[in-house]
Regions:
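N-terminal lobe of the biotin/lipoate ligase/transferase fold
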Residues: 1-138
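Active-site donor-binding loop signature of nucleotide-sugar glycosyltransferases
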Residues: 8, 143, 183
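A short beta-strand motif that forms part of the nucleic acid-binding face
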Residues: 49, 145, 172
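Short, conserved beta-strand/beta-arch hydrophobic-aromatic motifs that form part
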Residues: 54-60, 138-162
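Short conserved catalytic/interaction loops centered on acidic-Pro-aromatic/His motifs
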Residues: 120-125, 151-152, 164-168
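A hydrophobic, small-residue-rich beta->alpha segment in the mid-to-C-terminal subdomain
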Residues: 163-183
Length: 183
């Protein structure tokens, strides 16, 4: 496995890199990879949709330099922005984790322990995916799996500026709000 820091990269461009690496892993010609990165401001809609959870027009997004992308990861609507740590594991899940649910648990546990390192008490919330600090979401997880290989991943809010989330109903969860390690 290799780890690649992509810096700040456009969501669509990162998706293409994921697809290329995914196809390499599936063909046995490329290494399993963990991409670490940030995205410029973007709102993404997963396979469960979420357009009804976007509270501004596409024109508003364009005027404010915020991209809108319909993507093939699991989950609903979320936002990405500089100051958010994004991790995309391109892993063979059966060999590494015993299945997607175990991988989700491991990813959540990594975020919980990372938050604890910075003095933030984070936890899982029954029936609400991701990692939470009280009633506020610290980390979202939305993945895709193709023939036993994962792609997409998690986003953990690090910077205290989580204002982009004000324009959506976070992950389609009424009443949910975002927090960050800095808050």
């Amino acid at each position: 496995m290799i780890i690649e820091d992509l810096g700040i990269i456009d969501y669509v461009a990162a998706g293409e890199l994921q697809r290329q690496r995914l196809e390499g892993v599936l063909a046995g010609t490329g290494p399993e990879t963990l991409f670490i990165l940030e995205h410029p401001p973007v709102v993404t809609l997963g396979l469960r949709g979420g357009a009804e959870n976007l509270h501004v027009s596409e024109e508003y997004l364009r005027q404010h330099g915020i991209a809108l992308v319909h993507c093939d990861r699991g989950g609903n609507i979320t936002c990405h922005y500089p100051g958010q740590l994004v991790a995309y594991p391109i892993f063979k899940i059966q060999a590494k984790t015993g299945g997607i649910h175990r991988l989700f648990w491991c990813m959540e546990e990594t975020v919980i322990r990372t938050a604890a390192h910075f003095g933030v008490v984070a936890e899982r919330a029954e029936g609400r995916p991701g990692v939470w600090v009280g009633p506020r979401k610290l980390c979202s997880i939305g993945m895709g799996v193709k023939r036993g290989v994962t792609w997409h991943g998690l986003s953990m809010n690090v910077s205290k500026d989580t204002g982009l989330f004000d324009i959506i109903t976070l992950c389609g969860l009424r009443g949910a709000s975002a927090t960050s390690l800095e808050k």
